[in-house]
C-alpha cells in the first residue's frame, strides 16, 4: 500500500513515523492547552506501574462500546479492512492491538500530543503500524479512503467536536465505518462543576491539578471503603436518577468526579482524574445531541451503546 496516496499533502516516512509537509491550521489557545495536558498525562501513564491493567480494561471495554461480542468477533470484522485509522491514539496500545489482530491491514495511529514519540518507540517491531502526530480535526487524509476510522474517548477534547466528527467521517470510505465515543451529560450539579473547570484550568498550574487529582483519588478510595449503599429519590429537575447507589458512585455521577478502582492503583486513578479536570476542551453530549451529529453527517447507525459515562457506536455512510 502506497501511504502517500492517502494524504493530500506530501509525506515522508521515517521508520514507523509519518511526517507531512503541512499547512495545518494553527491550534486555538484551548487546544494548545489540551495538547500540553495530554502530553503530560500520557508521559505519567507510561511511567506508571499498572498500565497493563488499564490497557486490559480498555480493550474489553472497547468491545462493549462498539458492538463486538469478543476479540475474535473484532478480528473477523477487521479482516477485510485495508486501512485503519486510530484517531487520538495516545500511547498507541489500541493501535498496536488492532494491528496485531489485522496483520494484513495498515493501521495509522494519530495523536496531537507528544505521546506519538513514545508509541513509535514502544511498537516499532509491528510492521503494519504507523504513527502520525497531527490534530485529528485536520489530518490531511483524503476523503473516502479509510475502511475503519476510530475516535475512541477523544473527540470531546478537540476545539470543535462537531467539526472533527465531520472531518473524520469524511475520510471514511463508502463501504467503511466510523467508530466514535462521546462523554454523556451528567446530573446538573456535576455539569456545573465540570463547566467551571473548563475555564478555571487555564489559571491552575498542572502541578496543582495533579495534586488535586491525587486528593480526588483518595476521596474516591475512602468513599468506596465505606461500602455504604442507600436509596436515592428521583430528582428530575437536577437530572439525578433515583435508585440504589453506592455512596461513592452517587457522588461520582451526580456531583464530583472522584475516580477510584483498586485494581488500577493510585497512579492510574490519579491520571484518570487529571484527564477529566485538566483539559480545557471536554464537551459532553445528550443522546439527541450525539444522534443529531451522526445524522447531519449523513451516517447510518450500525451499532449504538449507551451507559452512564458515555454514548458510542459504529456508523457508515
What are these regions, as identified by a protein language model?
Residues 1-144, 148, 152, 281-283, ...:
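Conserved N-terminal segment of class I S-adenosyl-L-methionine
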Residues 177-227, 246-249:
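Conserved class I S-adenosyl-L-methionine
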Residues 152-155, 181:
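Residues lining the SAM
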Residues 232-268, 279:
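Glycine-rich phosphate/pyrophosphate-binding loop
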Residues 162-174:
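A short glycine-rich, Lys/Arg-flanked "PGG" loop and its adjoining helix->strand segment in the class I
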